[in-house]
């Protein structure tokens, strides 16, 4: 399955950029991967850019109000999408103000990383690592212990 990762901006902090690059490289062993960086001056512009970037792919928005997954549950979700014929999933991290209500209501799924507020750069690393971990679980590999 193809994964399309959409972020508002790029990781600015060195640790986050290096973490993103490492897990992006690892994730490419399991999925075709597309990364799109979008921008906008307002929340509405950012959300519109995310919507355009996702195209027709089901859109999973990272949002604090969203469903929380354990790593095995995320793996099962990805597997179910693939078995169900979904060829591509788009995952999006919004800007500092999050996503608009309109984009949220049109999303395939809202995914919450937890109750903590994370810096944008760290959320990017958590996203790509979580997808990598879920992929190794699906492949029966020992990364997740």
From Swiss-Prot:
Protein function: Specifically methylates the pseudouridine at position 1915 (m3Psi1915) in 23S rRNA.
SUPFAM superfamilies attached to this UniProt entry: alpha/beta knot
Family assignment from sequence similarity: Belongs to the RNA methyltransferase RlmH family.
Organism from which the protein derives: Deinococcus deserti (strain DSM 17065 / CIP 109153 / LMG 22923 / VCD115)
A Gene Ontology term for the protein's cellular component: cytoplasm
UniProt: S-adenosyl-L-methionine binding residues: 62, 94, 113-118
Name of the protein described by the UniProt record: Ribosomal RNA large subunit methyltransferase H
Reaction catalysis annotation: pseudouridine(1915) in 23S rRNA + S-adenosyl-L-methionine = N(3)-methylpseudouridine(1915) in 23S rRNA + S-adenosyl-L-homocysteine + H(+)
HAMAP family, alphabetized: 23SrRNA_methyltr_H (MF_00658)
